């Protein structure tokens, strides 16, 4: 971090950190625009009535008294906390606070993590390989062929900085030994664009294709599949049925199976698109099983390592919630079971309209938001107690996925708080002191710094980088290094099972919407710049072009040229994208890199609040989504059908790409002869 005269100027990764090695993604680089954003709240505010956007400045003492009174007056179990993926350090305070009140655990649901399939993937690893659920890190650098089923790891999946480095190592070999990448997904992402083969698979068919590949390997005795103890896992697979369901011919499936088995260190990765369907649990397991069939699990050449257990319970964070947990909270709120709701996130924007969070929020008597800007959910709050930005805050986070070793990342202020904001950790510690009793006993620290010192003291006696018995030296070392991690690689490997379950099957996926009325499958995807929409208030991210379309500052819908011609659509036409639950307007982008039966829309735009750079730009594709769930209760975000309605008007999409020559080439393609 470059700081001059008390002002932050430039952010970079920590060169000592085992995951990023000094590199940073676009969203990390743009963090300065969170700190210096002109639309940040300067102090605590009260809104009366909710939804009017008439905010009255409030002294922090008055605000904390109001909240403490509300907590004390709440019915038993009627205090609730909703958040996205909050820092582990905040979870370590919120968890004991709620427990002291005999309130249910926090509901922590992150839409980007859901689109990445984190929980489904972790649960599948635990289910197949005989351990606890643990998020894997796939060793691309040591692989010689990678079959990626919808894992867009060069853009947004899990840790694109770490995976980008690993992919560079995969491609860094001598000519002919540069690794081989096959990308299975219905839309060509940046990862598919750099792959050796892109397989435009039908949405929801990833699991049956993985099963078919395994079946071919077993039947032909390819590679380590010959006499494998895991062969029975694939016994029920139907190669012809998989070809029909996926749109990938049986001949190509055979070619792919032989290619996968023909390498020494093959790796199969189940990415977000596999986990976005009602068959998520079955399909993710099917892809993972290819690694076991290839003999690439559990030894020094394992295709993946696992997130290790935390060094101490203090660093474990809170359990991540499923979409089913969110639905249960919504029902509690709607039924009057929540007197006070704390919100650390933006569920009114992040959740599908069909989830009906707006109506449930209106039923909550008192709502407290911790947003540093007025977002859609904060507009419906009684109090906004703005948190510091991360550049003004203390905290810690266990890296997940961890790479080749456990890493406890540190967070410390690089500048003094610019405004009269307050760390959310300090707010809960203050409330605990005011409430006395069990809350004070559970959270005895007067402020966040003392809490952090106590947490870091648990590292005393651990191995390098600062092996010492002195807590003060550990605290100093943690701040100097920027966290804690071993100096040498120590991956946690999965256990190789004796045999995977026999006769595994992947059922037919369900889709929301009747095919005749809604003929296209919707493929929402995470924006490389805006993420799930949290980056929309940062103009550097707004103007960052999408790597495949070069679009920015608006919302577009990607449509195959054949589909566009059939609908009479041209580039920059405005259409209505309609699902059974809602509708949005979007600009047409004619894109050959997508299946004709699929339309794709990026996440991130469509805010009605969140400041001048985010509000009233584009549309929010999350509004269209179904509330169907897959295994483990996760949202089946890729299971929505839509229709396209031309609106008879045009709006030019801001983009770097020019159509000069492109449209001419398309016309040439159509010409006879």
Residue ranges and their predicted role:
Residues 260-335, 483, 495-499:
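A glycine-rich, hydrophobic/aromatic-adjacent loop/helix-cap motif
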Residues 50, 56, 215, 222-246, ...:
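N-terminal leader/propeptide and maturation segments of large enzyme subunits in energy/redox metabolism
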Residues 1-222, 229, 240, 249-253, ...:
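N-terminal export/assembly segments and adjacent metallocofactor-ligating motifs
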Residues 452-548:
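Long, low-complexity segments enriched in small/aliphatic residues
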Residues 156-177, 286, 353-367, 404-406:
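A short, gly/pro- and small-residue-rich
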Residues 149-150, 193-195, 237-239, 269-272, ...:
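Flexible glycine/proline-enriched surface loops and loop-helix/loop-strand junctions
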Residues 375-410:
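Flexible glycine/proline-rich, aromatic-decorated loop/lid segments
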Residues 356-358, 362-375, 413-425, 429, ...:
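Phosphate/diphosphate-binding loops
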């Amino acid at each position: 971090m470059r700081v001059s005269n008390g002002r932050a100027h430039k952010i970079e990764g920590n060169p000592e950190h085992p995951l990023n090695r000094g590199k940073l993604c676009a969203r990390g680089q743009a963090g300065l625009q969170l700190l210096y954003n002109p639309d940040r709240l300067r102090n605590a505010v009260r809104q009366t009535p909710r939804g009017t956007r008439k905010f009255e400045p409030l002294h922090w003492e008055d605000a904390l008294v109001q909240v403490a009174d509300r907590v004390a007056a709440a019915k038993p179990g009627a205090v609730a906390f909703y958040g996205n993926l909050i820092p582990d350090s905040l979870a370590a305070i919120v968890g004991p606070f709620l427990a002291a009140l005999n309130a249910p655990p926090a509901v922590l649901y992150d839409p980007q993590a859901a689109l990445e399939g984190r929980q489904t993937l972790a649960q599948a690893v635990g289910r197949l390989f005989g351990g606890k659920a643990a998020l894997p890190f796939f060793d691309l650098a040591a692989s010689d062929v990678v079959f990626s089923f919808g894992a867009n790891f060069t853009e947004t999946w899990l840790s694109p900085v770490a995976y980008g480095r690993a992919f560079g190592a995969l491609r860094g070999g001598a000519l002919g030994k540069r690794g081989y990448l096959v990308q299975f997904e219905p839309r060509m992402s940046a990862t598919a664009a750099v792959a050796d083969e892109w397989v435009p698979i039908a949405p929801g068919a990833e699991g049956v294709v993985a099963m078919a590949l395994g079946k071919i390997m077993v039947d032909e005795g390819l590679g380590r599949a010959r006499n494998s103890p895991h062969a029975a896992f694939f016994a029920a697979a139907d190669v012809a049925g998989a070809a029909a369901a996926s749109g990938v011919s049986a001949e190509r499936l055979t070619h792919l199976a032989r290619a996968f088995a023909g390498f020494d260190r093959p790796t199969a990765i189940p990415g977000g698109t596999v986990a976005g369907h009602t068959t998520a649990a079955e399909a993710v397991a099917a892809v993972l099983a290819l690694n076991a069939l290839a003999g690439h699990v559990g030894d020094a050449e394992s295709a993946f390592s696992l997130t290790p257990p935390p060094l101490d319970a203090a660093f474990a964070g809170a359990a991540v919630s499923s979409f089913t947990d969110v639905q249960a909270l919504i029902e509690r709120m709607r039924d009057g079971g929540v007197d006070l709701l704390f919100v650390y996130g933006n569920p009114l924007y992040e959740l599908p309209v069909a989830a009906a969070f707006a109506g449930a929020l209106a039923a909550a008597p008192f709502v407290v938001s911790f947003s540093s800007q007025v977002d859609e959910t904060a507009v419906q709050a009684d109090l906004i107690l703005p948190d510091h930005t991360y550049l003004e805050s203390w905290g810690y986070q266990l890296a997940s996925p961890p790479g080749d070793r456990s890493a406890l990342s540190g967070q410390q202020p690089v500048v003094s708080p610019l405004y009269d904001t307050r760390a959310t950790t300090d707010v809960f510690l203050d409330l605990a002191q005011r409430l006395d009793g069990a809350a004070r006993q559970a959270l005895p620290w007067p402020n966040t710094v003392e809490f952090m010192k106590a947490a870091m003291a648990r590292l005393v006696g651990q191995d390098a980088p600062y092996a010492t018995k002195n807590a003060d030296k550990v605290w100093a070392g943690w701040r100097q290094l920027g966290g804690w991690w071993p100096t040498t690689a120590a991956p946690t490997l999965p256990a190789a099972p004796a045999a995977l379950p026999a006769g595994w099957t992947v059922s037919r996926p369900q889709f929301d919407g009747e095919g005749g009325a809604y003929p296209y499958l919707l493929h929402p995807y995470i924006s490389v710049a805006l993420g799930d929409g949290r980056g929309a208030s940062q103009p550097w991210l707004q103007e960052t072009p999408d790597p495949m379309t070069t679009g920015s500052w608006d919302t577009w819908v990607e449509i195959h040229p054949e589909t566009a011609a059939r609908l009479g659509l041209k580039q920059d036409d405005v259409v209505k994208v309609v699902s059974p639950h809602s509708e949005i307007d979007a600009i047409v982008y004619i894109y050959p890199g997508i299946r004709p039966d699929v339309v794709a829309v990026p996440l991130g735009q469509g805010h009605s609040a969140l400041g001048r750079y985010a509000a009233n730009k584009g549309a929010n594709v999350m509004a269209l989504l179904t509330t169907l769930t897959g295994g483990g209760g996760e949202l089946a975000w890729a299971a929505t059908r839509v229709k396209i309605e031309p609106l008879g008007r045009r709006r030019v999409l801001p983009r770097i790409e020019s159509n000069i020559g492109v449209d001419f080439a398309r016309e040439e393609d159509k010409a006879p002869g």
